[in-house]
A protein has these predicted regions:
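An N-terminal, well-structured beta->alpha segment
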Residues: 1-43
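Generic secondary-structure signature for well-ordered alpha-helical cores
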Residues: 12, 16-23, 39, 69, ...
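Glycine-rich phosphate-binding loops that contact phosphosugars or nucleotide phosphates
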Residues: 35, 44-177
Length: 208
């Protein structure tokens, strides 16, 4: 029989998962790779993952793009049908796989390295000793929190932590590059956020 959670227990489990994100992850190495490859080298950040992890990867890419770091999502399966040609030698790739064993993502690494042997990879995973961890340059652990799903299977707490680790990278890079309200308004013209960013532009918040 599956476990039954109260609303309070679900919220507590999600909060605890965030509290137990490892503090000793090499965040600085991941941030430095993005800065050196994208902002200094002119490459792009490519994110990738399958299933729910892939949806998180897509969100991270769009958030990076809107905040001054050119990024896009590459579907691991579509990469095998021509989309791998979107990758350039100066890029850096951010992979997300909770198990660290996702076949399509492992194949993506192998195929990319066949084209560009020195292209660096960052991995967000719940399994530090996984096959993917052995292949990448930087591993960021989620702490492998138990899923709050009553079956213990559906990605729930794990995807919460993946999202937060993505936010950590985005915000850290924004701060390093000095991203301003004006910069934001140029990339996000429409909607409430576009209006708000333009309202906040002042002589003290110029573009870089």
């Amino acid at each position: 029989m599956s476990k039954q959670y109260t609303i309070t227990e679900i919220l507590s489990a999600e909060i605890e998962a965030l509290r137990t994100i490892p503090q000793d992850n090499d965040y600085e190495a991941a941030i430095s790779l993005i800065l050196s490859r994208v902002h200094q080298g002119g490459g792009r950040l490519i994110t990738s993952g399958m299933g729910k992890a892939g949806q998180i990867a897509h969100n991270i890419a769009t958030t990076f793009s809107s905040t001054g770091t050119p990024a896009y999502f590459l579907h691991p399966s579509e990469a095998q049908h021509g989309d791998l040609g979107m990758v350039c030698e100066g890029d850096v790739m951010l992979l997300i796989s909770n198990s660290g064993k996702t076949r399509e993502v492992l194949e993506l690494v192998a195929l990319t390295r066949r084209m560009y042997p020195h292209l660096p990879f960052i991995l967000i995973t719940g399994n530090n000793e996984s096959p993917l961890s052995e292949l990448v340059d930087v591993t960021l652990s989620t702490g492998n929190p138990p899923e709050v799903c009553p079956l213990g299977l559906t990605p729930t707490t794990s995807t919460t932590v993946m999202t937060v680790l993505g936010d950590l990278l985005v915000v850290s890079v924004m701060q390093r590059i000095g991203f301003t309200y004006h910069d934001y308004s140029l990339r996000h013209h429409g909607g409430y956020l576009g209006d708000k960013s333009r309202e906040l532009v002042t002589p003290e918040t110029p573009a870089k």
